[in-house]
Each structure stands twice: as structure tokens, then as C-alpha cells.
Amino acid sequence: MLYKGDTLYLDWLEDGIAELVFDAPGSVNKLDTATVASLGEAIGVLEQQSDLKGLLLRSNKAAFIVGADITEFLSLFLVPEEQLSQWLHFANSVFNRLEDLPVPTIAAVNGYALGGGCECVLATDYRLATPDLRIGLPETKLGIMPGFGGSVRMPRMLGADSALEIIAAGKDVGADQALKIGLVDGVVKAEKLVEGAMAILRQAINGDLDWKAKRQPKLEPLKLSKIEATMSFTIAKGMVAQTAGKHYPAPITAVKTIEAAARFGREEALNLENKSFVPLAHTNEARALVGIFLNDQYVKGKAKKLTKDVETPKQAAVLGAGIMGGGIAYQSAWKGVPVVMKDINDKSLTLGMTEAAKLLNKQLERGKIDGLKLAGVISTIHPTLDYAGFDRVDIVVEAVVENPKVKKAVLAETEQKVRPDTVLASNTSTIPISELANALERPENFCGMHFFNPVHRMPLVEIIRGEKSSDETIAKVVAWASKMGKTPIVVNDCPGFFVNRVLFPYFAGFSQLLRDGADFRKIDKVMEKQFGWPMGPAYLLDVVGIDTAHHAQAVMAAGFPQRMQKDYRDAIDALFDANRFGQKNGLGFWRYKEDSKGKPKKEEDAAVDDLLAEVSQPKRDFSEEEIIARMMIPMVNEVVRCLEEGIIATPAEADMALVYGLGFPPFHGGAFRWLDTLGSAKYLDMAQQYQHLGPLYEVPEGLRNKARHNEPYYPPVEPARPVGDLKTA
């Protein structure tokens, strides 16, 4: 053994060939700060071996290296710029020394090689991969850019266009694509990986392969003519501006850095990468996006822990077809759980099956599946007008009309048709679960399961624990949601649960602004372009359905009369009374017509201004700051109340529910991350300016306490240690 650390070791293989093996405790390898330091020590040992002829890098895990240790990022991002720059220089010196070894090197790459894992293999001369490879640089999705030489080596290896596509979008690619663009040199079966890598290494040692020529382009300026450079970088900047926009500085910074570094050799180019990385790491956007990643891991880990002793349902059923029922049935069948779809109406069943078939056909068009797979999936959805097959199902989700009487009747009838251990769930969006449970003989087997529309796209499923829901019931429903590829978050019961409970105060803020003379077009523009929501409130209401919102608003007002009962006729009432229900009937805040692809396209409609004039004061202008404050304060206050009342368990789960369920702008990180970034005291000052607007603007006592003591909602993070203090792994 030449070297042994906690996460990697170095040993001789044969004839002067050494192997460096990543083998961290646990299930995956990560390139954390200690592992980078260890790698440096191992390379130091190699540099002393006069009889070294070649080096093989490999992993003892199912994945090569999944990336840097993102749990370290928040503490690294807190250190002063100079200290972070020193750490990057240190890490890059390690990869440079790997690249500069006076012998040929090869990485045998299996599974994931992402972020730092990808940057590590870019420093070797050759790369051989297995068919399950996923390789790429996802850093821009975390608000940063590659920092271990990825933005320098990849363009010089692949050419600017292919590298920009991966780096700017934060993409990873599979084995076939990686081979096609030159990111790997070959793909072999897993059992042949080491043998194949050794064969390439021997050819390089024997002089049959010119490894020095292979290495050289990575050390030199990017080979690109002036015209080619102008075209590549102009197109890339245009694409980034269109897709990422101003709220995500990392992609455009990465493109500009690659452009600026193109004319330099490795050392100068790495210095430019360092200078660009450090300021990005100190942005609020990077902290928020890293926070989302960590919260996502936390939420998924919680679901995994909850379901460790529970069997995933093998057969499911959906009550109520139509678009929503068809979407749920498709998602379940697509992920391998056969489903019975029941409705009392043949037309609705046809609609549900058509929806499932449409979604599968889209997968076929994209080349994700073939005709055989499509037929196989659709054959596991069984439409029925009766309860045939319900005696075999493990779980049933009810998705009928949002009416408590109808839901209670359907659930009570279904309970008589299923096994005593079958779990029942309701896809209600607002009706308290404990109220629906009153109709059941086995309320412990019942809970809420709130999907978001469109089901196949929206990652969140709210799992609602009723007063009598058992732990086993919750675990089974969480297991099914996870199997469906969704992110389940368990919340406690109340009107609107978590997501709708916090959404309707936001809509109330919108209604009050309109009442006071604001223009809905400006509000939408500000909330989309400035705050960063995917849709402004008017457009969102049109998509949700004005009739749906009108009904839900009444349910919420009954549930929380002190805050949510209004004493005036608002814009939602006016549009509802005029039969303007949004996209579903082509008339809402806008008029809708189908475009060439059959998607609704919004157009101005002067008639809506006349309708709104009946419920509004004369038009006046509001500043962007006031619009954002008046829209967001009611929502954030309600989010805080939900945490204080135990409706949602943690700030992490609240923020993920907002991002995955409502499209809360990821670069803000969620309501609690936004609050922490703004500071509770500053938020309190802002909110107090609007408390005259009513109870929705009154800041909860818990938040006032946070402001008084200057406490964040997320646990404080300690800055990382200086480079000199690093311990090896």
C-alpha cells in the first residue's frame, strides 16, 4: 500500500502501474475538502515514485464521485473572498499535479461523475466509462460555476459549443452522448471496465497511443478562430439570457469567463475561473440554491426514513377520472404501480384514458419510450364504471368534485368495497381531512393526498395527517408518492392544509391592491420580472380557474374568518359572476385563444377593465416595492403561522413545498430562506408599514421574537476553516 486515507487509497497494480481508488465510508464518494487534501497527499507519494509508468483512477462504489460535498458549501461560502480563493487555488494545484504526472493516466468511470467528480476525471488523459454513466457539471444550478478547472478543461477538450451547452445549463449527459462529444474515450460493460482501462494504459505506456498529445490541448489556449468564438459565445449568451434571466447570475458568468479565458493557457485561465467563482459563491442566489438542494435531500431522507418498514403499494386505484384522475393514473402506471380508474361517467373515463394516452404519446415523441413500452404502461390502467378489482387494491385516492358531501359519500361507499387494510386518501385541495374522515368506519386508514396540476410535472404531493390517521397509513401513502417520483411532504390538517392556506392570503393581497386601484397587468409584471414568480397572480388565477379560486376562497374564509373573511366584493367575485373562469372557458383576466400547438395564448381584453372598475377605486400607480411587499407579506405571515401551529414541521419542508408546489422563485430559496436573507427585523419594519390593511398584515408573535433577538429560521452556519487547517481524509 503506497498511501491510505479515510476516503481513498493508492496501491501498485503491476509493472509500474498504480491505482488510486476512491472508497469513502458510506454508500457514495464525495469530493469534500478532506478528500481533496488526501488526493493531494496521494499525488505527492506518486511524484516520488521513480518507477511509476501509469496511473489508473477508479471507484469502489456504484458511482465514481457524485460531486463535491454540498453540505460544506454554505460554510465555504461564508469565508472571506481571499480565503475562498486560496482554497480554490489549493484544490486546483492538486488537479494540476494529477494532470502533470510524467506518465499516462486514465479514469475508469462508473455511474455518476458530477461536478467535482467530473472535474477530477477531466484532469486525466483518458476516460473509459460504463453504460450507466452520468457525467456533467451541474454547478450553475447551485448558483455557482465549476471551480476545479471544469470551465477551463472541458472547452479545450470538447470545443466551445459542447462545453458551453453542458456548463451554462448545468447539464449531465449519458454514456452514448459523452462518447459522441469526446467527454469519454470509450464505453464498456461494467465487468470489463478495469480490464479495458488497463489495456488503454498499456498502449499509452508502450507508445501505441500518444498520451502527451492528448494532454497538450488542455494546457493551451482554446483553439477557436475569431469568427467561431464570436458565434459560439454570442449564441450562448443569448440562450442564457433567454432561459436563466437576470435572477440567475451563474450561467452568464460562466459563459463570459470561458470566453475571457479562451485566449490563455491553463494557469491564467484557472485564475480567471477562480476570480469569477468567488463572487458568485457570496451571492444570496448561491446560498438559496444550495439551500434548496440541501432541503431537497432532507425532505427525501425524511420520506425514506418514514417508509423504511413499509411495503410500497403494488396495486392502486383512482376514484374520479377526468384530467386530474387520468394524470394520477398515468403517473402511477408510468412508475410501475398498476391502477384501476373508476368513474360513474363513461365520458369522464374516456377523458381520463385520453389524458394518460396523451402523456405517454409525448414520451414516445421525445424518444423516451418505444411503442412496446407505451402499450405496456397503458395496459396497466384499468378503466371501470364499477368496483371490479377494488378488493385487490392496496391504496385508493379519491379525486372527485371538490364538494364535501360528494366526497364523503364516495369515500364511505368505497370503504365497503375494499379490504380492511386498504388505505383511502382524498385529493381534496381545501376540505379538512378530519371532516371527511367522519364519514368512515376506519378513519385511521384515511388521510389526504393533495396532488398539484399538472400531475406529471408538479413534483410536490402534500400528505395530510387527519386527527385519526395512523402512522402506518401516512407511511404507505408517502411510499406510493415516492414510488410515483414525487416529493411527499407530510403536513397536519387544517383548511387549505399548507400550500393553499398560504396561497390564498397572497391572492387576498392581490385583491386588495386591485381594490385600491392597482393595474393587474403591472402587478403580474412586477411579481414575474422583479420578484421572480413563474406567473403573476392574475395569470395564475386564470390557470387555476376563477371558479375554483372563488370556491376555495370561501372555504378558507370559513376556516379562518378572523383573517380571511373579507368585507368587500373583490375582483375574483366580479369575474366569477361574469362567468369568466380563466383558461378553462377562454375568459378570465385575459382572453385566451389556442396557438398553433393547441396551447392557450393570452390576449388583452378591454371588457375586464370595465368589470374591475365596479370593484376598484380609480386607477393609480404603485411602486414595485409596494406591490412586492403587499403581495408577499400576507403569504409569509401565514407560512410562519403554519410553522408555529405545527401544520408544517420545519422551515426546510415549508420552503420545499412552496418551491415545488407553487413555483416560489428558487433563487429566493423559499419563504424562510427569503426571510433569513432579508433579516427578520427588516421584514418586521416593512410589514408594520402595511398593518393598517388588516389582520393578514399583522406579523405573528414568533416572527416578532426572531426580529427582537436577531435570530434566523435556519440554523446558523460556521465559516469553513482556512486551507492551512485542512485535515486529510
From Swiss-Prot:
Residues 311-729 are annotated as: 3-hydroxyacyl-CoA dehydrogenase. GO terms for cellular component: fatty acid beta-oxidation multienzyme complex. GO terms for biological process: fatty acid beta-oxidation. Pathway: Lipid metabolism; fatty acid beta-oxidation. One of its GO terms (molecular function) is enoyl-CoA hydratase activity. Substrate binds at D296, N500, Y660. InterPro entries: 3-OHacyl-CoA_DH_CS, 3-OHacyl-CoA_DH_NAD-bd, 3HC_DH_C, 6-PGluconate_DH-like_C_sf, ClpP/crotonase-like_dom_sf, Enoyl-CoA_hyd/isom_CS, Enoyl-CoA_hydra/iso, FA_oxidation_alpha_subunit. Its EC number is 4.2.1.17, 5.1.2.3, 5.3.3.8, 1.1.1.35. Keywords: Fatty acid metabolism, Isomerase, Lipid degradation, Lipid metabolism, Lyase, Multifunctional enzyme, NAD, Oxidoreductase. The active site is at H450 (for 3-hydroxyacyl-coa dehydrogenase activity). The record marks E119, E139 as: Important for catalytic activity. Residues 1-189 are annotated as: Enoyl-CoA hydratase/isomerase. Transmembrane segments: none annotated. NAD(+) binds at M324, D343, V400, V401, E402, K407, S429, N453. Residues 708-729 are annotated as: Disordered. It catalyses: a (3S)-3-hydroxyacyl-CoA + NAD(+) = a 3-oxoacyl-CoA + NADH + H(+); a (3S)-3-hydroxyacyl-CoA = a (2E)-enoyl-CoA + H2O; a 4-saturated-(3S)-3-hydroxyacyl-CoA = a (3E)-enoyl-CoA + H2O; (3S)-3-hydroxybutanoyl-CoA = (3R)-3-hydroxybutanoyl-CoA. Involved in the aerobic and anaerobic degradation of long-chain fatty acids via beta-oxidation cycle. Catalyzes the formation of 3-oxoacyl-CoA from enoyl-CoA via L-3-hydroxyacyl-CoA. It can also use D-3-hydroxyacyl-CoA and cis-3-enoyl-CoA as substrate. Heterotetramer of two alpha chains (FadB) and two beta chains (FadA). In the N-terminal section; belongs to the enoyl-CoA hydratase/isomerase family. This is Fatty acid oxidation complex subunit alpha.
